[in-house]
């Protein structure tokens, strides 16, 4: 029979501590109730990301020749206290935790002390000690195969985007065609890259360009058949000023997340 744990203090204090939200569900809120509690205690892995270096050996040359770098996946470890008021409640806590961690693809991982950053994480494993009482300190290992972190979606209306992220981001850009036309050009002035469409477009048509997925839609339908693949280039937003020029002119809506390392 497990010892009884008074969860009153945890119930009072979890709102003030570091909360863990995964796939839209806050673990403290889902697992803290009259039958037990969950409290994030410590998080590691949110700092510097390790790099991998590609090098080449050259005969007769000291050392190696550096070619390029890439970032390794980010490993985040969540240390937490989980408890139940009795044996049965304790087992139910773990059933619920398993359910909350079960996703088929990397999902949003957000921490209460860093609410404006989103990690794309997949649960990998748990370090759980032998059950000697109805409360335990456990460790949850989350893998971010893409080590970068994001902000919530931002929307800018107009031709100028002042991008604050430290890494490039690929926006979604949409607009309503203002006049009947047979060619549309969307230019990123600083990069001198553009999207060119050659087709029949009438006033009121809606064009949506997804730079990440490399899709173009006209009124919700695939429009890549009229995409100038030879000369066009999908582009990103870079840190600082990003000036967009649409011909013929129309109001642009730019949606993006800021990306940080």
Task: Tell where the protein language model's regions lie, with residue ranges.
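Polar/acidic, low-complexity leader/linker segments enriched in S/T/G and N/D
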Residues: 1-54
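SsDNA-processing nucleotidyl-transfer enzymes
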Residues: 50-65
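Residue-level recognition of well-ordered beta-strand positions that form the cores
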Residues: 79-81, 110, 141-143, 174-176, ...
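Oligomerization/assembly interface segments of phage tail-like spikes and tubes
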Residues: 61-88, 134-147, 242
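Short beta-strand and beta-hairpin "edge-sheet" elements
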Residues: 106-148
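Short, acidic/charged, Gly/Pro-enriched secondary-structure junctions
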Residues: 4-8, 19-21, 79-124
């Amino acid at each position: 029979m497990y010892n009884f744990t008074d969860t009153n203090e945890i119930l009072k204090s979890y709102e003030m501590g570091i909360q863990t939200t995964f796939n839209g569900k806050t673990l403290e809120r889902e697992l803290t109730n009259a039958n037990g509690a969950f409290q994030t205690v410590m998080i590691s892995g949110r700092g510097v990301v390790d790099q991998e270096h590609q090098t080449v050996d050259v005969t007769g040359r000291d050392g190696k020749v550096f070619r390029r770098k890439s970032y390794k996946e980010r490993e985040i470890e969540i240390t937490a206290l989980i408890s139940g008021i009795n044996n049965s409640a304790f087992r139910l806590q773990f059933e619920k935790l398993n359910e909350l961690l079960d996703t088929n693809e990397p999902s949003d991982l957000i921490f209460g002390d860093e609410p404006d950053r989103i990690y794309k994480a997949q649960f990998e494993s748990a370090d759980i000690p032998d059950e000697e009482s109805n409360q335990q300190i456990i460790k949850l290992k989350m893998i971010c195969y893409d080590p970068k972190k994001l902000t919530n979606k931002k929307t800018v209306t107009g031709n100028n985007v002042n991008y604050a992220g430290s890494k490039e981001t690929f926006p979604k850009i949409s607009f309503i065609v203002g006049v009947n036309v047979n060619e549309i050009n969307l230019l990123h002035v600083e990069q001198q890259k553009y999207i060119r469409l050659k087709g029949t477009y009438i006033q009121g048509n809606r064009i949506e360009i997804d730079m990440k997925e490399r899709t173009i839609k006209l009124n919700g339908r695939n429009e890549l058949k009229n995409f100038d693949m030879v000369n066009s280039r999908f582009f990103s937003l870079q840190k600082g000023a990003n000036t967009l020029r649409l011909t013929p002119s129309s109001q642009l809506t730019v949606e993006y997340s800021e990306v940080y390392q």
